[in-house]
Design a protein with these regions (language model features):
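Compositionally biased linear targeting/interaction segments
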Residues: 2-4, 8-13, 17-311
Length: 311
């Protein structure tokens, strides 16, 4: 009887020790998770603060009259974030660039009939093997998307297309708020969207194209469409002058038969795109800036949109 009692006591002690070990392990695991979660929260906060370094750099660069905003790579990057400032925020690495959004074609310009032919030529030059009727359909559908609703139009082929999607949806009937809306337009598949993405943008107002920063693909679509010889001549002139000035516009639009309203040599809209990396997390940062100049030449910059990890 005594041996049975000792065995029961031993089993009870082992059971209690097991419970204590399980509880201690659970508490230790919970503590580790809390510490890790706190560390991630603190690092997220530091990442957010580090992005402000890039935003101040971008705004300061845009208001500085000595800053040379010249295209560095195809796509409109006009200024690269200095490597000397990449470690400015402790324990963070920052990189990025400032992009000229008026180096791209603004889809919201399509409300103006004059830009519809420019967009068609951009599509034609980009998708050389595509049927012209398919490209014209995209121009028509995109114009329909960004234009105000017309009750007299009724249900047409475009409306039928949107109704048949799963799930069905309606066009915006207003300027695009994000370039991702273009993927929803009738006739635009993933390949077309991704191919055009570096050349297009959706800005809140109608914007002319900057001759100083636009890519050859965009320049070739201007006016009635530049020939290869005209495009080469224009690019050579741009390289010789480094940057076109306002006084050069009249000569350029006359020689290359480009409507003056379609082009400019100074942009208003820019994109600051950057990446901030910490020990365990990283963050992509996008900020659209609007620069204006008053009569005295003084420039001011305002933030239009600010997003994280997606535009």
């Amino acid at each position: 009887m005594v041996h049975k009692q000792k065995g029961s006591a031993l089993l009870s002690a082992l059971f209690l020790m097991t419970l204590v070990a399980i509880a201690a392990t659970a508490m230790s695991t919970r503590l580790q998770l809390d510490i890790y979660r706190t560390r991630l929260t603190l690092e997220s906060g530091r990442l957010m603060l580090a992005t402000q370094v890039m935003s101040f750099w971008a705004m300061d660069s845009l208001v500085n009259p000595n800053t040379k905003l010249k295209q560095k790579v195809d796509g409109g990057a006009v200024l690269v974030y200095p490597e000397s400032m990449s470690k400015l925020y402790p324990e963070m690495t920052m990189s990025g660039a400032l992009y000229d959004l008026q180096a791209r074609f603004n889809l919201n310009n399509l409300q103006d009939v004059g830009y519809q032919s420019v967009f068609f030529k951009l599509l034609k030059n980009t998708f050389k093997k595509a049927e012209l009727k398919d490209l014209q359909y995209i121009v028509t559908a995109t114009t329909h998307w960004v234009s105000p609703y017309q009750p007299a139009r009724g249900v047409d082929d475009l409306m039928t297309y949107y109704y048949e999607q799963k799930p069905p949806y309606l066009p915006a009937y207003q300027p695009m708020q994000s370039i991702t809306e273009f993927r929803l337009v009738a006739g635009v598949n993933a390949e077309i969207f991704l191919t055009l993405l570096p050349q297009i943008v959706a800005l809140p107002t109608s914007t002319p194209i900057n001759l100083n920063t636009a890519s050859p693909t965009i320049l070739k679509a201007l006016g009635n469409g530049l020939t290869d010889a005209q495009l080469t001549e224009l690019l050579q002139l741009r390289d010789q002058k480094e940057t076109f000035k306002a006084s050069d516009i009249l000569l350029l639009v006359t020689n290359f038969h480009i409507p003056a309203a379609q082009v400019t040599v100074e942009s208003e809209y820019y994109l600051c795109a950057g990446k901030v990396s910490g020990k365990e997390l990283s963050l992509n940062y996008y900020m659209v800036l609007h620069r204006t100049k008053d009569r005295t030449g003084a420039m001011t910059v305002q933030v239009v949109t600010e997003t994280l990890n997606s535009m």
